[in-house]
From Swiss-Prot:
GO terms for molecular function: endopeptidase inhibitor activity; identical protein binding; N-acylglucosamine 2-epimerase activity; peptidase inhibitor activity. Keywords: Isomerase. Catalyzes the interconversion of N-acetylglucosamine to N-acetylmannosamine. Involved in the N-glycolylneuraminic acid (Neu5Gc) degradation pathway: although human is not able to catalyze formation of Neu5Gc due to the inactive CMAHP enzyme, Neu5Gc is present in food and must be degraded. This is N-acylglucosamine 2-epimerase. GO terms for cellular component: cytosol; extracellular exosome.
Length: 427
């Protein structure tokens, strides 16, 4: 038998597995989007309900600005990139959500600071002294511009982006956070991560903005890479502004899912920059390292928090399994495999995806449970709340469906020619 035949059979089997996952992911994306379209739209005031029980019933009508922005972004991205989602109902809901944000998100217009929580009809309830409501507001406006062509949305996005950059790099006083003498000058990884995500968002197919924010993107990547500490053996969630480890629990804190999400943000940056050396570093430190330290050897799934010195983490939910770290891990491993071809990363994608689909998805009512015990049992039956909306699950499924489709569209390698039998006269 030709030596090339088993290899060809292996490749065909791999393609069958990729195709099966593409179909499985696509069907799940349809179910998840249908859940949010059926249960979350506020037809009276615009925007979205995110506090939804298992069956989709609204248990609280407060509106969280960052989740409003995420859902607008998600709907517009689906509308733009998938033919089956290109229908008026989805875009109209996104526009209604965008208009709700334009009217009510900012606490004291023309100031840019956004509320964290609004009443159903848009009155501010709470403000956070962070940049995250504003970041998702920016993402929403940019995607609305891309989906509708209405320039006013893009103007809003760029103005808010420039305000965020000012807060982060020049003067944070506008966030309202007091400078306390005993507080360490800490940099959470979330800040450069979020900015890098915005750089990618605004620069997509836009040479002018890509050029404007190119230096910022490099700055963000450097700041994220500073979180690799202890001679490359740990990625820490918080470091000093100078890139050094901080003392105490804050300094030892690790979040494997967040590191994996940072990993695929950095991978996109590497791909755009054409930097294979950085890509290899990112795969090693931001994909493989957090997975091997963060995967529960007894019950499967990723721990939510860890302590770099193996003390018991102080967060009560540290051992729980949450939906979003697993969504981000699926994206990270599939993106890493798509770019590097390393079969180890594909096997890890399958491992995480099998666990995630088995434990989190709700085959009866749709969408995914968000909060499981360490053993993988449902701890909270809600499908949405102050921190879970229409974002991590559909973003994961949409990106994975696209990446799986791209892998399947690649031509299969040509089989190696069979060796020519040696001539007996030459023996």
């Amino acid at each position: 038998m030709s030596k090339g035949l088993p290899a060809r059979q292996d490749m065909e089997k791999e393609r069958e597995t990729l195709q099966a996952w593409k179909e499985r992911v696509g069907q799940e994306l349809d179910r998840v989007v249908a859940f949010w379209m059926e249960h979350s739209h506020d037809q009276e005031h615009g925007g979205f309900f995110t506090c939804l029980g298992r069956e989709g019933r609204v248990y609280d009508d407060l509106k969280y600005v960052w989740l409003q922005g995420r859902q607008v972004w998600m709907y517009c991205r689906l509308y733009r990139t998938f033919e089956r989602f290109r229908h008026a109902q989805l875009l109209d809901a996104a526009k209604a959500g965008g208009e709700f944000l334009l009217r009510y998100a900012r606490v004291a217009p023309p100031g840019k600071k956004c509320a964290f929580v609004l009443t159903r009809d848009g009155r501010p309830v709470k403000v956070q002294r962070t940049i995250f409501s504003e970041c998702f507001y920016t993402m929403a406006m940019n995607e609305l511009w891309r989906a509708t062509g209405e320039v006013r949305y893009q103007t809003e996005a760029v103005e808010m982006m420039d305000q965020i950059v000012h807060w982060v790099q020049e003067d944070a006083s506008g966030l309202g956070r007091p400078q306390l003498q005993g507080a360490p000058a800490a940099e959470p990884m979330a800040v450069p991560m979020m900015l890098l995500n915005l750089v990618e968002q605004l620069g997509e197919a836009d040479e002018e903005l890509a050029g404007k924010y190119a230096e910022l993107g490099d700055w963000c990547a450097r700041r994220i890479l500073q979180h690799v500490q202890r001679d490359g053996q740990a990625v820490l969630e918080n470091v000093s502004e100078g890139g050094k480890e901080l003392p105490g629990c804050l300094g030892r804190q690790q979040n494997p899912g967040h590191t994996l999400e940072a990993g695929w943000f950095l991978l996109r940056h590497c791909i755009r920059k054409g930097d294979p050396e950085l890509r290899a570093h990112v795969i090693d430190k931001f994909l493989l390292l957090p997975f091997h330290s963060g995967w529960d050897p007894d019950h499967g799934g990723l721990f939510y928090f860890q302590d770099a010195d193996n003390f018991c983490p102080t967060q009560l939910e540290w051992a729980m399994k949450l939906w979003w770290p697993h969504s981000e891990a699926m994206i990270a491993f599939l993106m890493g495999y798509s770019d590097s071809g390393d079969p180890v990363l594909l096997r890890l994608f399958y491992q995480v995806a099998e666990y995630t689909f088995r434990q989190f998805r709700d085959p009866e009512y749709g969408e995914w449970f968000g909060y499981l015990s360490r053993e993988g049992k449902v701890a909270l039956s809600i499908k949405g709340g102050p921190f879970k909306g229409c974002f991590h699950v559909p973003r994961c499924l949409a990106m994975c469906e696209e990446m799986l489709g791209a892998l399947l569209s690649r031509p299969a390698p040509a089989p190696s020619p069979a060796p020519t039998p040696a001539c007996r006269g030459a023996e």
